[in-house]
Amino acid sequence: MIKKRQTRIAMIAGEMSGDLLGAGVIRELKKHLKNVEFIGVGGPQMLEEGFQSLANMSELSVMGISDVLRRYPQLYFIRERLLKEWTINPPDVFIGIDYPDFNLSVETRLKRQNVKTVHLVSPKVWAWRQKRVYLIKKAVDLVLTLFPFEESFYQQYDVPAQFVGHPLADLIEINPNNADLRKKYNYKPDDTILAVLPGSRIGEIKYIGPLFLEVMQRIAVEMPHVHFIVPIACQELYPVFFKQFQARYSHLKIQIIQGNAREAMAISDVVLTKSGTATLEAMLLKRPMVVAFKWSKFTHAIIAPQVKIPYVALPNLLANKKLVPEFVQEKATANSITESVLNLLACPSQSNLNKQFTAIHHTLRQNANEKAALSILKILETSSA
């Protein structure tokens, strides 16, 4: 039986996607636990569910090795402050949401203190630095995976893991109808729209923002009738992108909005996005896309030799074949990306692609938040036994 005293659940989300996942799990856990406290680090979505954040989530947001090295003292201070708090007043369970390097170090320390640990969202050990699986095995009591191939990977190493599905697959309809949304953004039904997503971190926008602006400029020349909508993930990122826009591209007619990335993709004909969760959302919305990724040469030189996967776009990884065009690092040029986007804009109706996207959608639609919450409740029961 779960203890009648207040249940204390510690969580850390390091970025916007983790905040969204954390909020969903909190919502489900509250249905089962009436006297519960959620503490740690989270963003606005988790805060809306009653989460108490002990640090600003944006302080944890880093991209690439150089950014980690530069901000290591700050990250170290936050981690040690949290661990001190949880040593004095241990949680019943700790849930690390993605953000693996930081969360695994916290999980390792807490597990030594007999705190139950769950990691939600598998670190990409199947992609690179595979030896981390042995650290994960020591650090966590359970890994909750969003994709089926991840559960199979962990089974090879006897790591407790459960595929719970992806919350976005539950949230987004199998056959979405987004015609009415166009009115909200003052677009006509027959307008051709390109949604452009340059990233959700400062480091991503630094490298990808200028590239995507150059692509938009070239598309505007070739297809002047195309409308551009650019959702910026949060308020802190807006001035970063706007400065890039003002520097050389202020003549472009771009609708820049704060947040609402899913709506921007939903009303679009084609999506241009950096790799990451946005590629999954675009797939679930059944939108053809072009995917690009770029980071510092220093980070790329260190990480690239360790990468063990043929693709970076999630639709390609889930299908185990190239469904959507993707361009990484030196291949991510304005010429190559523009050509691919123009091809899709010329023929946005992709019935075969839509069928494959739909099949993957069904696989991922598992009522993920509920499955994750039930797994966490089982862990709580063992901790209180």
From Swiss-Prot:
Cystine bridges: none
Catalytic activity: a lipid X + a UDP-2-N,3-O-bis[(3R)-3-hydroxyacyl]-alpha-D-glucosamine = a lipid A disaccharide + UDP + H(+)
Biological pathway: Bacterial outer membrane biogenesis; LPS lipid A biosynthesis
Class in the EC hierarchy, top level: transferase
Gene Ontology cellular component annotations, sorted alphabetically: membrane
Keywords: Glycosyltransferase, Lipid A biosynthesis, Lipid biosynthesis, Lipid metabolism, Transferase
EC number per UniProt: 2.4.1.182
InterPro entries linked: Glyco_trans_19
Top-level taxonomic group: Bacteria
GO MF entry, a single one: phospholipid binding
Any Pfam family hit: LpxB
One annotated GO biological process: lipid A biosynthetic process
SUPFAM superfamilies hit by this protein: UDP-Glycosyltransferase/glycogen phosphorylase
PANTHER family: LIPID-A-DISACCHARIDE SYNTHASE, LIPID-A-DISACCHARIDE SYNTHASE, MITOCHONDRIAL-RELATED
HAMAP family from the UniProt entry: LpxB
Cited function: Condensation of UDP-2,3-diacylglucosamine and 2,3-diacylglucosamine-1-phosphate to form lipid A disaccharide, a precursor of lipid A, a phosphorylated glycolipid that anchors the lipopolysaccharide to the outer membrane of the cell.
Family statement: Belongs to the LpxB family.
Protein name, UniProt field: Lipid-A-disaccharide synthase 2
Organism of derivation: Legionella pneumophila (strain Lens)
